[in-house]
Amino acid sequence: MNDEHTFLMEVRSAEFFEGTLATETPVERYGQDEVLLISPKTVELHTKDVPLLDNHNQGRQIGIVEQITVVGKKLVGRIRFATDRYSQEIMEDVKEGIRQNLSIGYKVLNSFIENGTVFVDKFKVLEASVVPIPADQNAGFGRSNDSNYSFRTINFNY
C-alpha cells in the first residue's frame, strides 16, 4: 500500500533585529564592579533560542534570541519578536528608537577577583530583555557595529 501525504507549509515574513546583549563594560553588582569577559571561550554559545523578555519579567516573553555570537568584545544577538499584539507594540517602539536598551540574565559558571573587581570568565546566557535602563550602558539595539541601526525582513519557512 502506497500512502501519500501532502503537507502545506506557510511562508511567513519575520523581522530580525541585531543588538548588543553585553560588553566588557564594568557593572556594579553588590558593591563591586563586575566584568563579563567576552570571547568564544567564556560564553556558552551553543544555547539555542534564548527567551526575550520584557524587563526581565519571566512571565512576559516577547520573543527569542535565535543566535548569539561574539563580535570583538561584544556579545551580539539576532532577535525575533513574537507575533502577539503586545510584543509587536514593543517591536514598533524598537523600530522608532523609543526602546533601545538590552540586558541579559546569566548564570556565572566561573569567576575570579582581581583588585576588587569580579571578572566572570565563564557564563551562560539565560535570557535577554528589552529594558528602560540597562546595567551595561553599551548594550542595546543598534550598538553591535558602527553603522546606523537598521532592521531587516527575512522570509523563511516554518
Language model features: what each stretch is:
Residues 1-158:
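Signature of dsDNA virion morphogenesis modules
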